[in-house]
């Protein structure tokens, strides 16, 4: 069955020179368009299959995109394209690099969200004050501290010393700018937060575990090595990242290391973020991307799913 695309959809499929910023909600045909764009990149010889990187935030979106792309191509070609979630890609970066470097964690266990919460509950059992805190609040604070550690490059073999350094920096900042009233970490530290993060990290280390924030943080750390980063940047000529509305600023910072000299397309629905609590700030990311990479901005405003639902609704 042939598919008819509207003008804006055709523009996304055919524009292979400029970077693109696509705003497209559910039902606008975005995933189909992305799969046809990948096929067009290959047909026009703009990149080989193994030089295309497609990333999503959720597993569901990743599976759907992979299925659509596979339906456009033969299996062997489709299988060469890197189609991952952002965390899956970070995992790939870590494990691939670990094979080449003796200093990097070679074998580790991934702690998903539920594993993480279980370990946190076990950790706070030793700190009575912390039991009054909501578990998701503790998760958020731990992830914020991990992110600060990565961004500030505070990495030694002494976990306790590293987080104590961050703690004292935080106290100094609050004292200087009088920020403690509105700061989540201040409250966390008042409820034994420093001991919680240290003991949580030590427990993870003992079990050779990495949580999802660790995947991003360690990929970010690896990309600080220009040789490693350049190697990954040269792998891909075309990069498409979907679900940007749910991508955190830290994840974007890690991925942006791959952008220079490549063709980049970001897509998402900036009005439908459901992960704001984990650092998702679509407008901040879109503004930064627009300013630095001067993309063609396209908005899919025709919702085919809504039209179909209206047509299928029986008359009253």
What is the predicted function of each stretch?
Residues 1-103, 230, 312-315:
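P-loop NTPase Walker
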Residues 46-51, 72-81, 97-112, 122-135, ...:
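Short, polar/flexible loop-turn hinges at active-site or ligand-entry regions and domain interfaces
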Residues 249-316:
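Conserved RecA-like helicase ATPase core segment
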Residues 1-23, 28, 32-33, 51-53, ...:
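Accessory N-terminal region flanking or inserted into the helicase ATPase core
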Residues 61, 65, 116, 134, ...:
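Helical mechanochemical/support elements of P-loop NTPase systems and associated helical scaffolds
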Residues 88-89, 142, 295-296:
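N-terminal helical cap/lid subdomain that shapes the substrate entry/recognition surface
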Residues 84-92, 239-243, 267:
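Conserved helicase core region in the C-terminal RecA-like lobe
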Residues 36-44, 67, 71, 217, ...:
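Short, well-ordered alpha-helices that flank and scaffold nucleotide-derived cofactor binding pockets
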């Amino acid at each position: 069955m042939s598919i008819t695309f509207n003008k804006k959809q055709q523009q996304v499929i055919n524009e292979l020179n400029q970077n693109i910023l696509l705003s497209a909600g559910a039902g606008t045909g975005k995933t189909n368009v992305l799969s046809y764009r990948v096929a067009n990149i290959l047909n026009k010889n703009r990149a080989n299959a193994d030089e295309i990187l497609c990333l999503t935030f959720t597993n569901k979106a990743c599976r759907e995109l992979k299925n659509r792309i596979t339906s456009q191509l033969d299996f062997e070609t489709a299988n060469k394209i890197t189609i991952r979630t952002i965390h899956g890609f970070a995992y790939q970066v870590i494990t691939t690099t670990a094979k080449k470097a003796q200093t990097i964690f070679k074998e580790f266990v991934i702690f998903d969200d539920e594993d993480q919460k279980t370990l946190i509950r076990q950790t706070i059992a030793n700190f009575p004050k912390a039991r009054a805190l909501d578990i998701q609040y503790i998760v958020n604070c731990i992830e914020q501290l991990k992110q600060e550690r990565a961004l500030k490059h505070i990495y030694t073999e002494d976990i306790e010393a590293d987080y104590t350094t961050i703690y004292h920096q935080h106290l100094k900042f609050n004292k200087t700018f009088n920020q403690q009233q509105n700061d989540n970490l201040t409250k966390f530290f008042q409820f034994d937060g420093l001991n919680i993060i240290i003991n949580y990290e030590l427990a993870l280390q003992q079990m050779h575990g990495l949580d999802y924030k660790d995947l991003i943080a360690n990929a970010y750390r690896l990309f600080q090595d220009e040789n490693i980063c350049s190697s990954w940047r040269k792998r891909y000529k075309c990069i498409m990242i979907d679900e940007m509305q749910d991508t955190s600023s830290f994840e974007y910072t890690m991925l942006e290391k791959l952008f220079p000299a490549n063709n980049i397309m970001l897509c998402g629905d900036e009005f439908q973020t459901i992960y704001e609590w984990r650092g998702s700030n679509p407008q901040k990311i879109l503004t930064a991307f627009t300013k630095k990479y001067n993309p063609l901005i396209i908005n899919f405003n025709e919702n085919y799913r809504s039209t179909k639902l209206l047509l299928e609704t029986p008359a009253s």
